[in-house]
Amino acid sequence: MIDNQHKTVLLYEAVDSLNIQNDGIYIDATFGRGGHSSLILSRLGSQGKLISIDRDPEAVKKAKLMKDPRFSFIQGSFSDLYHYVKKLDLMGRINGLLFDLGVSSPQLDDAKRGFSFMRDGPLDMRMDPSRGLSAAEWLMKVNVENLAWVLKNFGEERFSTRLARAIVERNRLNPIKSTKELADLISHVIPVRNHHKHPATRSFQAIRIYINNELQEISSALNAALEILSLGARLSVVSFHSLEDRIVKNFIRQHSRGPQILRGLPLTEIQIQSMWQPKLKLIGKTMPSQKEVLDNPRSRSSILRFAERIN
């Protein structure tokens, strides 16, 4: 039941990395439009199970179309992964867990969701429009200092303070209500440095990440993975920008290599091992092929990292 209008990035590579077992129990923590879930189901045997999660209303509609007794769907955030699995009494029994982070193409292409500076629509940006403040509402409340912090830390925007002042001042005079209004303001304030990249790219990313608490949710879900996965299970994560990938890379490194021990400390290797045991084994990373990037330019920045649960 794959959405023909949505090209799932690293589709086969991500599912291959899960090393599917016929009778295994798998979680697709970011159902989206069902691309990964459909392929996982095609590789499962009759006794296998797939649990998919998403909070996006359009994803919920797609999931309802998947009529398969091996498939179940949870409407919610993947940051609550631990609680979902505990409620299902499946702790330590999950054979594979997949995350496909960020915003999907259908979300970007739907103007009324307010994610894209390329399509004019209400300035919303919420993954779940029924919860929390929209981007427009938040921008009306935030002060210059806090907005500049978000733009700098979540968008790596060099002109964060200048832009924050302009947004707050504009909202004081005439509230920003649409994506086009915000994009036009950003384009006016920020000098064009890269003609291949819209000046609003970083700011829209930063605001979206903040509105949806994305980075904290990723960290929470990754920590839950260590509790829910069985020995030998796979953890696979597709990320799309450096902030996401840094969290994933550091998490896998931390739980496969262990803490950094300062040189000169009087500790033997046996003492260090007694204090800490690795929980993950790095298996590899994959980036899209040249053909995939040509077919789907949005895949260009993606990277898949995958590891195995050990000990």
Curated annotation (Swiss-Prot):
Superkingdom per UniProt: Bacteria
Alphabetically ordered keywords of this record: Cytoplasm, Methyltransferase, rRNA processing, S-adenosyl-L-methionine, Transferase
A Pfam short name: Methyltransf_5
GO biological process entries: rRNA base methylation
Catalytic activity: cytidine(1402) in 16S rRNA + S-adenosyl-L-methionine = N(4)-methylcytidine(1402) in 16S rRNA + S-adenosyl-L-homocysteine + H(+)
Cell compartments where the protein resides: Cytoplasm
EC category: transferase
Assigned EC number: 2.1.1.199
Residues annotated for S-adenosyl-L-methionine binding in this entry: 34-36, 54, 78, 100, 107
GO cellular component, one term: cytoplasm
Keyword Chaperone included in the entry's annotation: no
InterPro entries, per the entry: RsmH, SAM-dep_MeTrfase_MraW_recog, SAM-dependent_MTases_sf
Annotated GO MF terms: rRNA (cytosine-N4-)-methyltransferase activity
Chain's role: Specifically methylates the N4 position of cytidine in position 1402 (C1402) of 16S rRNA.
Family: Belongs to the methyltransferase superfamily. RsmH family.
Name used for this protein in its record: Ribosomal RNA small subunit methyltransferase H
Organism: Hamiltonella defensa subsp. Acyrthosiphon pisum (strain 5AT)
Gene name of this polypeptide: rsmH
